[in-house]
Amino acid sequence: MKITINQASEFVGKEVTIGAWLANKRSSGKIAFLQLRDGTGFMQGVVVKAEVGDDIFATAKALTQETSLYVTGTINEDTRSPFGYEMAVSSVEVISESHDYPITPKEHGTEFLMDHRHLWLRSNRQHAIMKIRNEIIRASYEFFNKEGFLKIDPPILTGSAPEGTTELFHTKYFEEDAFLSQSGQLYMEAAAMAFGKVFSFGPTFRAEKSKTRRHLIEFWMIEPEMAFYKLEDSLQVQENYVAFLVKAVLDNCRLELDRLGRDVSHLEKMVAPFPRITYTEAIERLHELGFDDIVWGDDFGAPHETAIADSFEKPVFITHYPKAIKPFYMPEDPENDQVVLCADMIAPEGYGEIIGGSERIHDLETLQARMEDFDLDQEAYSWYLDLARYGSVPHSGFGLGLERTVAWISGTEHVRETIPFPRLLNRLYP
């Protein structure tokens, strides 16, 4: 019977066949240990010469790294194994040999590994990170479905940029100009006026010339929008959502976290509610910490976010940023017209902003005035202005960056490892 490695617990004491790749191998004169990988997990296969005979043992000893094969044998429990089970191999059938596999068990530099990203994905570490990424995606759908959100797919090609920025990828759309989407937010606002609570999950593209460990050119975002939600309502959704993601990974990816050496004691503290401070309070805190380079009205850089987050064990919301450094669609605070009703969620341990969100302006005249302040072409946004013309309501939304969230929860230093094929400032291959 053919099974996968993650089914091994169901077949203890039985003879089965597994299709796999050889991740690694070690052998002595009379026994060979095969580390097998099939995409669902890893398992050790033990080949004993006295039990399988000379021919099968010779085949096993000659196997090269990443050769694909069928292995047949009996599944046994093994508490010494990191996988919990191993196979007593009775036969080996080679499917396709692998010659001179470039990523050997020795250490390799990052650029070399990125050049071979299509092969690096096969490694134990990358397998663990991708499993955690998948769990975060799965749990996101579970959370929003349970909360009554409708999944909406906004366009990737757009005729305008939601934040009025120049950091756009331009392309031709037949005879018109088009851009790769930086965010589906404006379209999600339209969907919220139709369906109440909606969310999207898809790629976004930002032509930022950044080389930091937090930035990708192409990344994925979860973007919910909620009609009749004020800022505090949205913050409660955000903290419950992030706490739900962390718990899902702790519950379902413990082996992967262990494999990555992640200290889960940090993650086990991620229970809502999360602390909140205003932008002004954050500036004061930074001055107390010796950051004299920043003044009220400046945006935060990575060192500032890290210093603020270090004061808390959980993610922290920074709310009420200056109006001048935030996008046009954010409403002023009724009690202070110099700040807007918004918040960024800053992850602990130096991982920076993982969520940005705000209330949205729903008054037509106010929205038009803000667009004039930003020198935006109102004709290009006429459809968006229609939302305020025809029965708009107070509403809020946010965007969670998937790769930064994966990096934080998995303890991965650089976001380039949190997406299968990263697009960086200097990398469009493979």
Swiss-Prot record:
Keywords: Aminoacyl-tRNA synthetase, ATP-binding, Cytoplasm, Ligase, Nucleotide-binding, Protein biosynthesis. CDD domains: AsnRS_cyto_like_N, AsxRS_core. It comes from the Bacteria. It is found in: Cytoplasm. PROSITE patterns: AA_TRNA_LIGASE_II. GO terms for molecular function: asparagine-tRNA ligase activity; ATP binding; catalytic activity, acting on a protein; nucleic acid binding; transferase activity. It catalyses: tRNA(Asn) + L-asparagine + ATP = L-asparaginyl-tRNA(Asn) + AMP + diphosphate + H(+). One of its GO terms (cellular component) is cytoplasm. One of its GO terms (biological process) is asparaginyl-tRNA aminoacylation. InterPro entries: Aa-tRNA-synt_II, aa-tRNA-synth_II, aa-tRNA-synth_II/BPL/LPL, Asn-tRNA-ligase, Asp/Asn-tRNA-synth_IIb, NA-bd_OB-fold, NA-bd_OB_tRNA. Its EC number is 6.1.1.22. SUPFAM superfamilies: Class II aaRS and biotin synthetases (SSF55681), Nucleic acid-binding proteins (SSF50249). The keyword Ligase applies. Belongs to the class-II aminoacyl-tRNA synthetase family. Homodimer. PANTHER family: ASPARAGINE--TRNA LIGASE, MITOCHONDRIAL-RELATED, ASPARTYL/LYSYL-TRNA SYNTHETASE. This is Asparagine--tRNA ligase. It comes from Listeria monocytogenes serovar 1/2a (strain ATCC BAA-679 / EGD-e).
